Amino acid sequence: MSVSDIFLKDILTATKTIAMVGLSMNETRPSYFVGRYLHTRGYKIIPVNAGHGGKHFFGQLVRSSIDEIDEPVDMVDIFRKPEAVPEIVNDSLAKLKGLKTIWMQIGIKHESSAQKARQLGLNVIEDRCPKIEHQRLFGELRKA
């Protein structure tokens, strides 16, 4: 599904809190770069990583699963393989009341999960990176 720049910009403007599923604490991993960038742009990042639950990262408690989140979340950003998407989406839909957007990172698509979330009124973005889109849409892309 093609999405417009206006649609993406509206999502990124309205979003305040992002649960990042699969966020790595390893500074060389793409999920770390994305989380750090979004955090420095004022987004509240809730890290979700089963291997690091209970630690703190970006000033937030790392949750082992979506089920451990007990605060409002606007977006779930998925950094996991496509096979993991159905469980993440189902858990997010069941637990995160008020959730507005499911975002699947570059290389991640899952049509039935995307369709399910859309049918419930959520925005769904597949195969894109919010860091790249934010930089592009808000004029922060820099030449190397």
Predicted regions located by residue number:
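Structural/interface elements that position substrates and couple domains in central-metabolism enzymes
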Residues: S2-P82, P86-I106, H110-A144
